[in-house]
UniProtKB/Swiss-Prot annotation:
Keywords for the protein's UniProt record, in alphabetical order: Carbohydrate metabolism, DNA-binding, Repressor, Transcription, Transcription regulation
Entries under HAMAP family matching the protein: HTH_type_MurR
CDD domains: SIS_RpiR
Protein name: HTH-type transcriptional regulator MurR
The SIS domain, residue ranges: 128-268
Pfam families with a match to the protein in the record: HTH_6, SIS
Residue ranges of the annotated DNA-binding region, renumbered to this chain: 37-56
Organism: Shigella sonnei (strain Ss046)
Amino acid sequence: MLYLTKIRNAESEFTENEQKIADFLRANVSELKSVSSRKMAKQLGISQSSIVKFAQKLGAQGFTELRMALIGEYSASREKTNATALHLHSSITSDDSLEVIARKLNREKELALEQTCALFDYARLQKIIEVISKAPFIQITGLGGSALVGRDLSFKLMKIGYRVAYEADTHVQATVSQALKKGDVQIAISYSGSKKEIVLCAEAARKQGATVIAITSLADSPLRRLAHFTLDTVSGETEWRSSSMSTRTAQNSVTDLLFVGLVQLNDVESLKMIQRSSELTQRLK
């Protein structure tokens, strides 16, 4: 019996940790080549032995055997599906009904949120919030879908009184980066962590003495190595994607948490500014 089928059939018997492992494997089956049991254990907040026992429960000798089998099953399934239906996004195909599409999208986003939240180091997050709160100036960088997340964060921070520079144009991003000073903060948003424009800006910011905070994936990347602080995000999207939907969901969960943490840090004044902003925009209607 195929391991994916075994996972589905045994789901009612899984413990909480086993369910976490099962959800992770199904959501990230296309990326398992680069996943070790150690990395997975850290990401899910469980022990490596739990992952090995899960593999053995399904009939594999260990995680490596299970991982390789799942990779093979995924490749075979992809070839079969590709021959009969068009991939529209992630696991969604042209054969799916709107109801099925809705369920798949919802689950994809749920998993991105669950797995991203499971990674939070709250002590480090509090430190990052304090660093941002003391920054005289904040620059936010990002490309594509990450740029949309960056723009949203910039609007939120400006609303509560922070001096923020956000500009989608990469030349402007680079220009602002080289003008940062010690004490300033650059928030770089990039899931891959390898976009040359974002890496260039991070290098420039570090050279000027600014603090670089990266919102990125767990993968080793140039941005991750440059950053003073990292906030990890997880997305189960495969190569079959039409847009970075669950990636943006994960990134937004991080930026929203940063915003609320900053509001909490200076709650009275922040709430006054939010109220004034609301009153002003109401007058524009």
